[in-house]
Amino acid sequence: MILPVFIKPVSNNQIFVKYNDGLEGNINLSFLFKNFIYQDLKNEEIFKTVCIDKETNDIVWANNITICKDMLYNHLKLLKLADNLKIDLSKL
């Protein structure tokens, strides 16, 4: 099972996450802010509370906002693949 093993906030919109298979990198989460559920993450103090839930291994914040670890893994994998193929995803 692929699980996150380390996470930290990098900026108000980005986190660094590392998975147990070695995949790691920064993920900009600003795309989540369009959904009202994630609006609190715009607050830098809340954003900085990011951690890995010990029971579910999901990515969580102090105010009970959760992001699926598998979604983030696949998102990061896609970002790495696009980078390797020299594809600018911002132009799609």
Report residues per predicted region.
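Motif-centric detector for short Cys/His coordination patterns
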Residues: 1-92
